[in-house]
């Protein structure tokens, strides 16, 4: 009996050893980083609220480059990087002897018939002979609060890094880069590997998700305002430090560098993984569906294209039932100790002081001063007239006797003549 029993136990032990060891779900201590300084000096301009441009303005005359982005494991980092040929654009500006340029970087998440604004940043009076983003003036970065908790811009502020993204992050992203009014679009198709990361800032399970989704009509009517639907966040240097700090505290390893995203080719769906997002052909087919975009979203038919019409889709509207994901708390909950809170850095600067108007003089005092001035002028005029009339009738004034030099000790005067 012992022989078969030992054989069975040995087989079970061998199977147990061959199984992968589950990753420990614990946090580790990491020295909190110091608040970083900006790479260069600039002036932060607080802009009043304004509309976010539509991401659906592309067409045949405006081609869109498409890239594919994924990560090796669920708890890894994901990079959305594509060279938009900014260096060539800036070199052309130098050849034109342009002293400066203006730029805007915007990120969207494209859904069925709508787009979610994720990130907005403006640059003014930029130096074309330096790297992109070296400018005299910049606005604060404006973020979707959910995405800001686990994502940050790359060092050149043109790419996007996500740390342990949740399953709901999959889909199509669009970057719009404006330089002196000319826009260049780049799409990123994000697909995640099988499995879920235990420390992801995920949506459905914990009730956090992206903000509202707006159809093309709302963008065209300038209803999507950046200060209404986006939140001001830390500068890029501090944003990177806080997300990396949170990622490393949960056992993550930040890569020393990130490779550029590959050209988009629909990958096969891995076992347990989500299928890749549709390509341009399916999107164009979707655009040709019924004009009633809202009905297309709610019915069993295929999703409409980005030009579909309808009301703005909030997370509650997308879910359609109570208990669906809702926007999460402030994304600075994981900031290192000693760092300024978002409330401390996101308040608008005080309005410029205007010189105060002088205190108004009471009416009675003003009347008294005016009366006194009139009396003084009248008295002076009366005195001058009195002297003039007296002298007019009296003739010329008598001459004073002319003194003559003394002769000896005798003084005398010249006779009047």
Curated annotation (Swiss-Prot):
Function as written in the Swiss-Prot or TrEMBL entry: Envelope glycoprotein that binds to host cell entry receptors, promoting the virus entry into host cells. May trigger fusion with host membrane, by recruiting the fusion machinery composed of gB and gH/gL.
Virion surface side: 19-360
Record's keyword terms, sorted: Disulfide bond, Glycoprotein, Host-virus interaction, Membrane, Signal, Transmembrane, Transmembrane helix, Viral attachment to host cell, Viral attachment to host entry receptor, Viral envelope protein, Virion, Virus entry into host cell
Disulphide connectivity of cysteines: 75-197, 114-213, 126-135
GO cellular component terms, A-Z: membrane; viral envelope; virion membrane
Biased composition (Acidic residues): 279-292
Organism: Bovine herpesvirus 1.1 (strain P8-2)
Chief location: virion
Disordered: annotated segments: 259-356
Glycosites: 41, 102
InterPro entries: Herpes_glycop_dom (IPR002896), Ig-like_dom_sf (IPR036179)
Gene3D superfamilies linked: 2.70.230.10
Intravirion side: 390-417
Gene behind this protein: gD
N-terminal signal peptide: 1-18
Sequence similarity: Belongs to the herpesviridae glycoprotein D family.
Membrane spanning stretches: 361-389
Protein name, as recorded: Envelope glycoprotein D
Superkingdom of the organism of origin: Viruses
């Amino acid at each position: 009996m012992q022989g078969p029993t030992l054989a069975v136990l040995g087989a079970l032990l061998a199977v147990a050893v061959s199984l992968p060891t589950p990753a420990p779900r614990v946090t580790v201590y990491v020295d909190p980083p110091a608040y970083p300084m900006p790479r260069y000096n600039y002036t932060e301009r607080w802009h009043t609220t304004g509309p976010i441009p539509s991401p659906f303005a592309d067409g045949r005359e405006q081609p869109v480059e498409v890239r594919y982005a994924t990560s090796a494991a669920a708890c890894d980092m994901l990079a959305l990087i594509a060279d938009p040929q900014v260096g060539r654009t800036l070199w052309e500006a130098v050849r034109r002897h342009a002293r400066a340029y203006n730029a805007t970087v915007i990120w969207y998440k494209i859904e069925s018939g709508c787009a979610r604004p994720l990130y907005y940043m403006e640059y003014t009076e930029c130096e074309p002979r330096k790297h992109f983003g070296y400018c005299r003036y910049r606005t604060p970065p404006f973020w979707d609060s959910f995405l800001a908790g686990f994502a940050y811009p790359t060092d050149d502020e043109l790419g996007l890094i996500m740390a342990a993204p949740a399953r709901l992050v999959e889909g199509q992203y669009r970057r719009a880069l404006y330089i002196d009014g000319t826009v260049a679009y780049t799409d990123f198709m994000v697909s995640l590997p099988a499995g879920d990361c235990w420390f992801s800032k995920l949506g459905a399970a914990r009730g956090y998700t992206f903000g509202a989704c707006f159809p093309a009509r709302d963008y065209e009517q300038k209803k999507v305002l950046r200060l209404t639907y986006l939140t001001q966040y830390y500068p890029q240097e501090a944003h990177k430090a806080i997300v990396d700090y949170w990622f490393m505290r949960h056992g993550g390893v930040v890569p020393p560098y990130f490779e550029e995203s590959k050209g988009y080719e629909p990958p096969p769906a891995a076992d347990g993984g989500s299928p890749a997002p549709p390509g341009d052909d399916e999107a164009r087919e979707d655009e040709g569906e019924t004009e009633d975009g809202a009905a297309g979203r709610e019915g069993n038919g295929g999703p409409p294209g980005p030009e579909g019409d309808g009301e703005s889709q909030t997370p509650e509207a997308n879910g359609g039932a109570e208990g669906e994901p809702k926007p999460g708390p402030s994304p600075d909950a994981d900031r290192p100790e000693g760092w300024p809170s978002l409330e401390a850095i996101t308040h608008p600067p005080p309005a410029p002081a205007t010189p105060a108007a002088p205190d108004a003089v009471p009416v009675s005092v003003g009347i008294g001063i005016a009366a006194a001035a009139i009396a003084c002028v009248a008295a002076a005029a009366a005195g001058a007239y009195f002297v003039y009339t007296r002298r007019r009738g009296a003739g010329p004034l008598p001459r004073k006797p002319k003194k003559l030099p003394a002769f000896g000790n005798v003084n005398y005067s010249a006779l009047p003549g």
